[in-house]
Amino acid sequence: MHKSTLETHHQPIMPVLALVLATFFWGSSFITVGSALEYTNPLTLVMLRFGVAAFFVLLMLKGRIADIPKRTWKAGAACAFLIYLGYTTNAAGLMTLQNSESGFLTALYVPITPLLVWVVFGKAPTKGAVCGVMMAFAGLVLLANPFTLSFSNNWGEWVTILSALISAVEIMVVGRVAPGTQARQLAFTQLFFTAVFAAVGLAVATAAGVPLKETTFNTTVVGGILWLAVIVAFVQVLLSWAQRYVPAGRAAVIFAMESVFAAIIGWFAGESLGTAGIIGGVLIVGGILCGEIRLPRRKAAPKELSS
């Protein structure tokens, strides 16, 4: 039986589809996060969102915390610290940036991740991966329309770039530790420690007198937290499994789909999506395909037999 003209390389397709599904749920959460933040602050939202999600994953584990190996706890704590730092720096950047500007700068993790993998592990990206990164990043530029950025005295821009670097490191670290762990156990430890770090951060911020919005527990906040917890629990299990098989650089390109899904869902919610946004979405999809699919090599022509 002949193989299809187009074939995926290196990894089976299911982990790639799992990452795409995870980015869909992440992208779908933007509107819920925005609504919840009208009645609470980012640290409280992260603490409750990840804490409830950890409880949901604990139910999947049937409460068997004692079965989680020490190395998984350590790996989960390291990943969670990066997740927490990424959320905190990104939220701080949003204090001085518009959503589109923040979205663009945060997406710098797409080109940063394969460069980090190259520098740290010596794994140079393939031509297909470079093509995919360039296309996906160009698409993100069109989606975010960041042309008002100044990079002068706006500290929020630099803090958001730091959050992108942290996200790139987190993707790389998860890709490194995931193969040696059980997906649900790693997901639980990440969620648990992220909630703990957020709680500590909230306590420190409160003690230091940092102005934080008080939380109003209405149906919007409670319902939002429960829904966001379901999403993050499901997504972390998917990521902990799929990143065993998909290299960090390629995973970063796939994660760029988060902006596409957020834009599409925003459009259904009444937000505008112009021609540039549509072209940007197409470029991101093209970047993923460029990195994941290749044409089979042509067989060398048989040499002519000498007479």
Regions found by a protein language model. Give the residues of each.
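Specific transmembrane alpha-helical segments of multi-pass solute transporters/efflux pumps
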Residues: 25, 29-30, 58-106, 113-114, ...
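Hydrophobic alpha-helical transmembrane segments of multi-pass integral membrane proteins
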Residues: 14-18, 44-59, 128-138, 155-162, ...
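C-terminal-most transmembrane helix of multi-pass membrane proteins
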Residues: 2-6, 17, 48-51, 145-146, ...
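Hydrophobic transmembrane alpha-helices of multi-pass small-molecule transport proteins
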Residues: 57, 77, 125-146, 164-167, ...
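Helix-helix packing/entry segments at the starts of transmembrane helices
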Residues: 46-48, 102-108, 174-196, 232-267
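Loop-to-transmembrane-helix transition segments
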Residues: 14-23, 61-90, 155-163, 212-234, ...
